Amino acid sequence: MTLWINGDWVTGQGALRVKRNPVSGEVLWQGNDADAAQVEQACRAARAAYPRWARLSFGDRQVRVERFAGLLESNKAELTAIIARETGKPRWEAATEVTAMINKIAISIKAYHVRTGEQRSEMPDGAASLRHRPHGVLAVFGPYNFPGHLPNGHIVPALLAGNTIIFKPSELTPWSGEAVMRLWQQAGLPPGVLNLVQGGRETGQALSALEDLDGLLFTGSANTGYQLHRQLSGQPEKILALEMGGNNPLIIDEVADIDAAVHLTIQSAFVTAGQRCTCARRLLLKSGAQGDAFLARLVAVSQRLTPGNWDDEPQPFIGGLISEQAAQQVVTAWQQLEAMGGRTLLAPRLFQAETSLLTPGIIEMTGVAGVPDEEVFGPLLRVWRCDTFDEAIRMANNTRFGLSCGLVSSEREKFDQLLLEARAGIVNWKKPLTGAASTAPFGGIGASGNHRPSAWYAADYCAWPMASLESDSLTLLAMLNPGLDFSDEV
């Protein structure tokens, strides 16, 4: 029984799904998808639970969420192992994911009060008040790269605001989704407040097509996000929050410390085996001898990166991709770029047959026409050389995406220029593109999405503002508008 609907674990009525470790092939989880009727059942449960949950005091909702935080802490080692085994990422990285889940809960609680709490301003004849109200029943679609942390960034603020939820994890990480749901169960959420439906495309389509849905919160690929946007078009009554991918540029203008810049680039491009939406996909490198030296060093250090299993010792920097198919897609993308005229500096290769272990790839595309503006979700970095900083900014903005952008330069003036001209939601200076602060907005523009699903800013789309003018008494004004006559004369 792998679905959680209205406070009960039930067996899915859809197709059988089997999840294997992407490196070892070990069977980790199996269960049946939710069919359309079960998705509808989950929605009815969420709708029935909504009025009572929304009317609870914020403190009562906060108690359940903080209890969940405590359970994350006490079950950290177990959840770390589940996430690592299911995604293929190293143990150290899965541990940081669980830590981020814990830390963002306190920030989400504070954000509710600061961004969506209640405010009152006194007026001469009364007061103006601002309150926030939950949307109702929300669907949350989770991604596979951070199957605990990123859905958590939607679920926690939504629950705190008073919404009820139907959560569909990625079909590639059902075990992590179930493990997190079991902790919510222990936290004492009332039946129907949070429901879990497992499944792939058919389950997702049934969920997003529900009429009695007040909104959908999504983190994942641009292709799926676009499909959801089309599906919900013409329905302005439903909140749609999309956090999608990016074709992110990293500009290397001047390098004082080559090794430091190489480390920043590797952290930007290859951490999580390149499976972060903020990963650098395009390296825009200044032409000249210094750029040549940097590039040679980048290749030399990158070719030493050896992917390994989640529990290898010593721990590897990168593990496997989410699946063998995902690894092969990266290799295919590299082969296509090479066929277009790209110059391979470091060829990505499958480290072991029938696994998702893939070494990083670097390919130079300077002067190659028609390079697709697509996100290759893996450890593949494309390089362009540029002569001026203005040219680098133009190249950086030459994308339909707008998630993250970074600059390595000793000149603050160039960063100030980039801040004015960059089309990206995250713009960093001498910091990896993949770094993020829980108190800062996380998200982008264009094909990268709309709202900002972080602990602090997620509060904005989990509740809507209600404005009120209020007075303790009602008396006739001494001065009336022209044309109004309240005299006693007939």
UniProtKB/Swiss-Prot annotation:
Name of this protein: N-succinylglutamate 5-semialdehyde dehydrogenase
GO biological process: arginine catabolic process to glutamate; arginine catabolic process to succinate
An MF annotation (GO) of this entry: succinylglutamate-semialdehyde dehydrogenase activity
Residues reported in the UniProt entry to bind NAD(+): 220-225
Catalytic activity: N-succinyl-L-glutamate 5-semialdehyde + NAD(+) + H2O = N-succinyl-L-glutamate + NADH + 2 H(+)
Cited function: Catalyzes the NAD-dependent reduction of succinylglutamate semialdehyde into succinylglutamate.
UniProt entry tagged with the keyword Oxidoreductase: yes
Lineage top rank: taxon: Bacteria
Keyword NAD set for record: yes
InterPro entries: Ald_DH/histidinol_DH, Ald_DH_C, Ald_DH_CS_CYS, Ald_DH_CS_GLU, Ald_DH_N, Aldehyde_DH_dom, SuccinylGlu_semiald_DH_AstD
Species per Swiss-Prot/TrEMBL record: Shigella dysenteriae serotype 1 (strain Sd197)
Catalytic class of the enzyme: oxidoreductase
This enzyme's EC code(s): 1.2.1.71
